[in-house]
Amino acid sequence: MIVTEKVKFISNWIKAYTDNMPNKAQSLVIGISGGIDSSVSSTLSAMTGLKTIVLSMPIKQKSFQHDLSMKHQEWLLKKFNNVEAHTINLDELFRAFSHSLSNFDNEHGFANPRARIRMTSLYQVAAA
């Protein structure tokens, strides 16, 4: 199977999966970081034709990382008319969280909460 066929196959599979849900999905929600995984996932989601909500959620991001996310967000908006894009800055929320646990400061320990805060934000948007 050539790449374009694989892309179409995966996008069609996502659409078929949502069509066969007991409560049919009205939209897809994807967090975008500017990395390859979220770029591919968000593009495949947009290709389904379903409303696709993409969220950039910076937490202690280096500017070049956030810039990649924003460039991909802009590209999606230009290429697909079913994409809705939002930036949710989670820096202040994470600062409050880490401050409340300042007696237990450990950079490795704080890596997982960043992912969980983003995950919770995705759940909230998807539930709305």
Range-by-range predicted roles:
Residues 1-128:
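ATP-dependent adenylation/nucleotidyltransferase module used to activate substrates
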